[in-house]
Curated annotation (Swiss-Prot):
Belongs to the rhamnose isomerase family. Homotetramer. It comes from Salmonella paratyphi A (strain AKU_12601). Pfam families: RhaA. Catalyzes the interconversion of L-rhamnose and L-rhamnulose. Its EC number is 5.3.1.14. Mn(2+) binds at residues 262, 294, 296. The keyword Cytoplasm applies. This is L-rhamnose isomerase. It is an enzyme of class 5 (isomerase).
Amino acid sequence: MTTQLEQAWELAKQRFAAVGIDVEEALRQLDRLPVSMHCWQGDDVAGFENPEGSLTGGIQSTGNYPGKARNATELRADLEQALRLIPGPKRLNLHAIYLESDTPVARDQIKPEHFKNWVEWAKANRLGLDFNPTCFSHPLSADGFTLSHPDAKIRQFWIDHCKASRRVSAYFGEQLGTPSVMNIWIPDGMKDITVDRLAPRQRLLEALDEVISEKFDPAHHIDAVESKLFGIGAESYTVGSNEFYMGYATSRQTALCLDAGHFHPTEVISDKISAAMLYVPRLLLHVSRPVRWDSDHVVLLDDETQAIASEIVRHNLFDRVHIGLDFFDASINRVAAWVIGTRNMKKALLRALLEPTDQLRQLEASGDYTARLALLEEQKSLPWQAVWEMYCQRHDTPAGSQWLDSVRAYEKEILSKRS
């Protein structure tokens, strides 16, 4: 530890102690908050089922930066490089299309054995795993419908895929000793004016009930459902709307997934957390950065990321909120994208933990909104960066932008050699 870092740390402890904050306790709390990194940033949501296939479902990964992972070995190597540069606990979020098999496997036939390499790798890297059925980029989703499809046979295919995915998720939780959160998102919707908005939602309701009919130990598996406002090619009608899934999660007591990019641009999910928590047992958050639409830009340490973290901390939701990331930028180094986004999420959590929330809550309760605003602004200038640097030091990760040197070296030695 350098003298400069030690001095900054000691001064930071004193400054935060003056406003009633124990920085050591804040760091202990931060170590209780894993962030689930999404595997699909590493290969632009291609997966291993058909890597040359088109990405569908109304989502886009734009850019052509060289060096994307082409197989599971490369993807895991890239993830390991990113993991070394991010302090504190992490998880990995997998989609079903990241299975490994010597022969083609239909999506309704996926089994735990197709993910055993991921489980062994997660054990070696002390990670929990989360999961997602992949209800897009497939011939049977080409017309824009999956679990709400009017064709019963196609609908059953997707039901069976989701049921098989739940078994994989439960396998993750059983093997790794930490529950896997399995999130269901479907692209179902219509491009133009829709006459019958009810029937697809009735079919989706019945399909989801069949999907979750098999019971699993909640210590191994947690179901989550995710809404969306619109997607490319489904601008006018989305079957799985916010109201649909809020009702479903409330009535079935599943987790509800809130994705930062899946609402109107004037809406923020930070404002939805406290409302949803009154009705659902758990929340899954997909922290992202929508630029004018669900563009899935890399997460910044911006106002909304900070507000999301503050809601979790202020209301002590550590055991009820699962933090995941969801972005995919193919225009920059993909390892760097993981590092930037995940470190920013953790920085936001740390800053929230360093807030004098009790004092602010008392001011609010007494009606002293002047002091509330003044202290909220003053605390932004407190030396949280010194606390972050100490946290990085304790986890043997670079404190500042030095991590970029490691990424550049990896790019030169490994990524640049990929065709």
